[in-house]
Amino acid sequence: IETENGVVRFYSLHLTHLTSETRMPQVKELLRIHREAGMEGPPVCGDIEMSGYWSEGMAKTSAPGAAVLLGDFNFQPDSNEYTEMIGPLTPCDGRVTHPLGFVDAWVHAGGDEGGGKTASVGSTPARLDYAFVSASLCDQIRSCWIDVDADGSDHQPLWLELN
């Protein structure tokens, strides 16, 4: 999506709820797709050798490096999957984020890493829904909040506002 800050890839997703062992390969694949997007190019469909009909004569664009991942990740902030997404926690300096990695928009906007309940695991409130933003976009996070009044799902919507 073209924004005032450049083109950004947005992903809406839902990872498996089964086990950490079934989610971790999904997390690793998301990170691989993100890191290799520039080399793989933009998504296209159909026969790209056609006369240019699909592109309406526009030149092929490159894949942007910036991305936002939104959705039900089915893991909690104390999980291995969360650490894989945003980096390890150090006792002195907080999370060590890879320059090509992601930040948790909820935390970057001032939310508590262990807080912000979006769903329940059994009868225990949990944060399973996230907005992960490319490290290169973290300064663009204006706000991130949970719509606690919404009742259209068993999860509460997580909203993200970027500059």
Residue ranges and their predicted role:
Residues 1-163:
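Active-site regions of metal-assisted phosphoester/phosphodiester hydrolases
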